[in-house]
Curated annotation (Swiss-Prot):
Protein name: Imidazole glycerol phosphate synthase subunit HisH
Pathway linked to the protein: Amino-acid biosynthesis; L-histidine biosynthesis; L-histidine from 5-phospho-alpha-D-ribose 1-diphosphate: step 5/9
Reactions that this protein is recorded to catalyse: 5-[(5-phospho-1-deoxy-D-ribulos-1-ylimino)methylamino]-1-(5-phospho-beta-D-ribosyl)imidazole-4-carboxamide + L-glutamine = D-erythro-1-(imidazol-4-yl)glycerol 3-phosphate + 5-amino-1-(5-phospho-beta-D-ribosyl)imidazole-4-carboxamide + L-glutamate + H(+); L-glutamine + H2O = L-glutamate + NH4(+)
Signal peptide, first to last residue: none
Protein localization: Cytoplasm
Quaternary structure, from the entry: Heterodimer of HisH and HisF.
GO molecular function: glutaminase activity; imidazoleglycerol-phosphate synthase activity; lyase activity
Annotated TM spans: none
Domain Glutamine amidotransferase type-1: 3-200
Organism per entry: Xylella fastidiosa (strain 9a5c)
Function: IGPS catalyzes the conversion of PRFAR and glutamine to IGP, AICAR and glutamate. The HisH subunit catalyzes the hydrolysis of glutamine to glutamate and ammonia as part of the synthesis of IGP and AICAR. The resulting ammonia molecule is channeled to the active site of HisF.
Active site: 78 (nucleophile), 179, 181
Annotated Gene Ontology cellular component terms: cytoplasm
Length: 200
């Protein structure tokens, strides 16, 4: 069985991500320090909360340098995806810079609520193993006030008063702005695709 490390970055979605993995037949290893990453074939960085608090927790856990050196597939979920980028406007905090780009606050408008909460359509941009067998027109469940504008690493977008990156993949570094653990069959498919993707 593939060893999956699930990082405890203090997010409230940790339990639901773990349960989603268990439904796929995977019992993840909960990780709170660098030693927990040893031997992992896949790493998942979930997150709910603020970027400054999450980065401080990763630093206190001694996980920043190990994440920067990581060679196996890594996926960030919701705030976890945002932490993969260079910088977040939320608290004006430097992030992991594993992917190029900056996290911006969503702009509210009369018909656009922030935070963005609920189901929204995924708009594929290019081929990716993460999107294998995900049907056209599939939707996912979002809860966020910050997002990454479209980048060259984006493989799917979402429109909420403007387009933003919904799924990102650059080599083995991946991210989902939505909550796959709350996105029914679409979310389960994307998690399975991540677990099965080529590690090269």
């Amino acid at each position: 069985m593939t060893e999956v490390a699930l990082i405890d970055a203090g997010g409230a979605n940790l339990g639901s991500v773990r349960y989603a993995l268990q439904r796929l037949g995977v019992e993840p290893r909960l990780v709170c320090d660098a030693r927990g990453l040893e031997g992992a074939a896949r790493v998942i960085l979930p997150g709910v909360g603020s970027a400054p608090e999450a980065m401080a927790r990763l630093n206190n856990q001694g996980l920043i340098e190990p994440l920067l050196r990581l060679q196996v597939p890594l996926i960030g979920i919701c705030l976890g995806m945002q932490l993969l980028f260079e910088h977040s406007e939320e608290g004006d905090v430097p992030c992991l810079a594993l992917l190029p780009g900056r996290v911006r606050r969503l702009t509210p408008a009369p018909s656009i609520r922030v935070p963005h909460m609920g189901w929204n359509r995924l708009l594929p941009l290019r081929a990716s193993p993460l999107l294998a067998e995900v049907p056209e027109g599939a939707s996912a469940y979002f809860v966020h006030s910050y997002a990454v504008p479209l980048t060259t690493a984006a493989v799917a977008a979402c429109d909420h008063g403007g387009m933003f990156t919904a799924i990102v993949q650059q080599g083995v570094r991946c991210g989902a702005q939505f909550h796959p653990e709350r996105s029914a069959e679409t979310g389960a498919r994307i998690l399975r695709n991540f677990l099965e993707m080529d590690a090269a």
